[in-house]
Amino acid sequence: MADQSSHQKYEFKKKLESLRGKKGRGTELISLYIPPDKQISDVVSQLRNEHSQASNIKSKLTKTNVQGAIDSIMSRLRYGTVPENGIVYFTGAVDVGANKTNMETTIVEPPQPIITYRYHCDSSFFLTPLEDMLKEAKTYGLLVLDRREATVGLLTGKQIEAFRNLTSTVPGKQRKGGQSAHRFQQLRLIAIHDFYKRIGDAASEVFLAVEQKDFEGVLIGGPSPTKEEFEAGNFFHHEIEKKVLDLFDVAYTDESGLSELVNAASERLEDLDLMVEKKLMQQFFRELVSDSGKATYGEDNVRENLIIGAVDILLISEDLRAVRETVKCTSCDYEQKTSREFKPGDSSSPTGNCPKCGSYLEITEKVDVVDQLSEICDQMGTRVEFISTDFEEGSQLLKAFGGVVAILRFNTGI
């Protein structure tokens, strides 16, 4: 069955994308954020005040639209109660093209509590508080180093980002002519110490800039004994020093080394969504390259396997946006079902003429592909996982496999 939290997150993200694409002609789109502890009577009273103030708007059309939007919200609030996380109303005259507008209302129950009451009127909906809820809070500091190079980065949610790359002036182990071995070794140790200090300062600057309540700790990667020398030398800021979690052997110290470090730390990070999703994609690829026949991809193949109950795990890209349309002839029995990708605000695709009789074709049904596949999974007891595009395998799922793949219970030959 579909994991409720991941499916709800997918639907929440899709709803925000739709709202982001809506525009008004003037400042006539209202965003109303109501916290869970706010009294409905107080909200209605404040909206009445906003309605009265809107009478001062010079443009007659804008005034009518703003007051109409406020009336629409008040009619919905009158008998309502505020859900446990609060509620958000997005209402207004949305520009639909051809010099026309349409009064629309979207109601959102957020996944996290609304903190502050807010009434906002503009030419677009105010989405920042809801968009912030999509951001992953947990952040890990990443550092990979040897005596030649170091890279500092952050792992936030599922995204790895490099912030600093440093190179050293540490001389090689072979000394130049005329230098005593002792003197050369002293200079080399000084250069190593200075480089470690530069690394510690740069990494501390990056890590301290993170909201510390969301900062889980630091992972250090590199060859031995370099990473151990660095960690023992207390080169981090004292607040960061306390948050070093573990050291891992990695071969690369450039940006690719950050990904290698995250993979090496997979056991420590096993509860992180990124690692769960990586393991699922790796399982799919293992089945795909083996001769087990227990991997399939492409919407049609996946759907056929779902219907017969053969799918163990359905993997769907978080960024997949597709609809399945049923097209029928207005004169004969011709019918066709096709899927197509869409973006918020897209209109229906052209239908054309019937290939059998030449009559006009019309779209008789349109369903969201993800919703439809998830519904079949619920009926069949199939597990559904949504995969982000913030890592290589997740990006491959969308770009190379069309956003839908499945791990099968048995080989069906489909």
UniProtKB/Swiss-Prot annotation:
Where the protein is mainly located, per its record?
cytoplasm
Cite the InterPro entries for this sequence: eFR1_2_sf, eRF1_1_Pelota, eRF1_1_sf, eRF1_2, eRF1_3, Peptide_chain-rel_aRF1, Peptide_chain-rel_eRF1/aRF1, Ribosomal_eL30-like_sf
Q: Where in the cell is it found?
A: Cytoplasm
Q: What is one GO cellular-component annotation here?
A: cytoplasm
* Keywords carried by this UniProt record: Cytoplasm, Protein biosynthesis
Please name the PANTHER family in this protein's record: PEPTIDE CHAIN RELEASE FACTOR SUBUNIT 1
Name the protein family: Belongs to the eukaryotic release factor 1 family.
**Protein name, UniProt field:** Peptide chain release factor subunit 1
Q: Which gene encodes it?
A: prf1
